[in-house]
Amino acid sequence: KIMAKPSKFYEQLRGR
């Protein structure tokens, strides 16, 4: 899950 910088996670959620 998100434990470090949730940068990629957020980008994927936003759908880039």
UniProtKB/Swiss-Prot annotation:
One of its GO terms (biological process) is killing of cells of another organism. This is Beta-basrubin. Possesses antifungal activity against B.cinerea, M.arachidicola and F.oxysporum but not C.comatus and R.solani. Inhibits HIV-1 reverse transcriptase and cell-free translation. Signal peptide: none annotated. Disulfide bonds: none annotated. It comes from the Eukaryota. Keywords: Antimicrobial, Fungicide.
